[in-house]
Amino acid sequence: MREQSVKRQAAVLACANGAVRALGFLLHVVLGRMLGAEALGVFELAHSAHMLAVTPVTAGLPTAVSRLTARREDGAALTAGRGLAMRAGLGLMLLWLALSPLIAGLLGDPRTLPALWVSAPCVLLSGLAAVYHGYCYGQGRPWPPAWATLTEQAARFLLCAPLLIPGLTVAGRAAIPGAAETLGEAAALGLLLLLLRRCLPGRLPRDKGLEKELLLLSLPLTGTRLIQTASRALVSGLLPRRLVAAGMPPTQATAAVGLLHGMVLPVIFLPGILTVAIGMAGIPALARREGPALRRMAGQLFAASLGCGLLGWAAIHGLSGFLANTIYRQPALRGLFRAAAPLTLLFALGQAAATLLSGLGQQKKTLLPTLVGTALLLILTYRWAASPLRLYGAITALLVSRAVSVLWELAAALPLLTPSAAPAAPSDD
């Protein structure tokens, strides 16, 4: 297997993630101006629900493929993962198309229906691409996923403007980003297959035992991500209703969701450029190590994530005025950016804990903290978003709930750094 250092892989992935996030950030700015806050809010409602269908095939399975590929020299993990992603992705895509009218009703806004329909193929496309990404990370090949991800984001950016036909309704404008995402995912998967055509394993017989092992490894992380995604969908549907209860007009409440989820939170997630790259390179690296080398690697990964979180917090707080006034041209966003800035540190620490637990095959320990944090988020959003705090109440709910789940995860992860607690990496026997 062609091996690269963890630092080199993380650097490649960080550069790719940086370019992707930069394009994504620019896309959100353009969409905010091009679609309008109300259409952006409708899109965010639909997208939060759409992620529920994508998460089962993009969350735990790629990590499991990466971990098993790092321990094996053949391509059996890719073959098994690809088969699982194909079957699950196709079934979920068809189910999503059939249930979209019901989901639009549950979201409380029928204008989300076109956006739900046009993004349905992403379920299958994203699942297949994610498995190939996991295979590449396990083999120490970060470049193919990096180029594919860049292609997907660039295609989304370039296609949004041509797809925006003059005279579209709010529902039609809200469907534009989803259509561009589907086309971008198709282009990215095609490029990925082209780049990997010479290094993919030959046709292998179906290995049900390996498929079962992949499922067992992926289920805890998939469950955790599903809970997180479901919480975002529920909060996206709950927040405008609670803002209306606080006295805000319905159209203004929908626009407020666009401000928070379409403008503020994408900036808060920007430091994830580095922490996600550290995690993607770190999981297979941890799976290959044991003893002192394992503990040393875990400590380095955790320290790097902590530094990224602190720097991100400081940067967003310091640049809040520039982001609000110059980038988004929404002066009211300055206070929201400052209030939400601590989330960057919490997300970085959560990523570090998840990386350590996933690398050691103990990702199930993230499930209960995530469940408790999600329940707390819904309760606090229900109460505080309807108070005079409004959007600031929703941000405070995010901070408190995330802090609880992250501290819980750290309590499970940090003891694994001690010599007596750190388990050895599983062998291939």
What are these regions (language model features)?
Residues T58-E73, I268-P292:
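Helix-loop junctions and terminal segments of transmembrane helices
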Residues A59-P101, P114, P292-G312:
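Membrane-water interface segments that mark the loop-to-transmembrane alpha-helix transition
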Residues G91-P114, L310-Q330, R334, A339:
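Short membrane-interface helical motifs at transmembrane helix boundaries
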Residues M1-L23, T79, K208-Q228, A412-A413, ...:
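N-terminal membrane topogenesis motif
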